[in-house]
Amino acid sequence: LRIEDTDKARSTPEAIDAILRDLAWLGIDWDDAPLYQSQRAARHAEIAHELVERGRAYFCYCTPEELEAMKDEAKARGEQPRYNRMWRDRDPATAPAGAKPVIRIKAPLDGETTIADAVQGNVTVQNSQLDDMILLRSDESPTYMLAVVVDDHDMGVTHVVRGDDHLNNAFRQKLIFDAMGWNVPVFGHVPLIHGEDGAKLSKRHGAQGAQEFRDMGILPEALDNYLLRLGWSHGDDEIFTKEQAARWFDINDINAGPSRLDFKKLEHVNAHHMKLADDTRLADETLALRGGNVDATHRARLIGGMHDLKARATTLVGLAADASLYLKDAPFDYDEKAAATLNDHDAHHAMHAIYDALARLGADFRDTEIESALRKIADAQYGGKLGKVMMPFRAALAGTMTSPPIAKAAEVLGQSETMNRLKAALHWMHDQGHSHH
């Protein structure tokens, strides 16, 4: 891991911490301590001077005014503004006294350079397109181009995979590798991700940083899976683990055309990974997202109910909303639909029957027993219409009409809390004016 922190304004401690935190969250580990580019300026400068000694780079003493004049002349001729190499073959002894030079590389003047890119295929540029770029500024600080190449070499980097907006840089970096006689890494320039409208991904498309996806309730393994599928595939496999990905992935299979970020598809992949995820882990992620302290009883309830909860949710945010079924205690408020269901004479009648039947279940408080008790009431009093019993039961237990399978939820809540919720519903109905005949 290398932190390219030479831009002091952007590389605040907070920004660097965010990178380390996001990588850790995504499960992307690294060997050795991170290398900080800014701490290696002396090493970078040493290589720039070595290139001068090898005759592959030179001191340039041009003043800012001279460079400005060159730009204007080139523009007047309708050419690209670039340095005219006036110091390339000049004797540094003729330099103005006290002038501080920059070091520039000697780019080849003719011929062409080809890079065998792992994603783009062979890419060739005319060397006349390459300029004698600056390697070391007059204050002895290295440019990004030099720093990157020296660091790649010293770290033993074998593959450089990055956005295709860096393709031009690869040719300039290859100049430095070649001039030092170093191995050039394999380059793979991957297309940039576009938004759903086909434009380059930007803030207006929504989430971009790992933290934003995390806040949306996306699991890291789902984000990894989804991002890997953007522009790369393995047959018809949509959902896979990191272990499978590591076995299957080949950089040469990446599409050279841009992919579109599809948030619906991401949620679909996330829903799958939630079903695969460990229930205890999901419960703890959910609790962390909700904040606040939760005691062991409520946590145990949430873990017990997680299998059914996660089957319905697409994100942790949705899961956190549904989790209140297990995290609250009676009495609690009923939403509009639940209140309408309970505020009914038949429902009041059913609720008493449910209460009496479940109170008799004793120790064997299981979903199958609960369901058969409710079915008996429906058969005896409502001509087998199960909804007449299940709907008020769901309203009383969940406080809302959408919930996981409710008999199983009752088993997870346990007899004591289930009875408390039924009692609270009966009190609420009584206050609405439904007396029991």
Roles of regions detected by a PLM:
Residues 279-382:
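Small-residue-rich helix-loop
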Residues 136-137, 155-166, 194-226, 230-238, ...:
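Conserved phosphate-binding loops in nucleotide/dinucleotide-binding enzymes
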Residues 58-189, 195-201, 209, 234:
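Active-site cores that bind ATP or allylic diphosphates and position pyrophosphate for catalysis
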Residues 19, 51, 55, 105, ...:
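Residue-level signal for inorganic ion chemistry
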Residues 365-429, 433:
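Charged substrate- and nucleic-acid-binding regions of tRNA-handling and nucleotidyl-transfer enzymes
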Residues 39-43, 192-197:
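Short, conserved secondary-structure transition motifs
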Residues 246-274, 311-315, 384, 394-400:
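Core structural elements
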Residues 1-79, 168-182, 222:
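N-terminal Rossmann-like or analogous alpha/beta NTP/dinucleotide-binding catalytic cores
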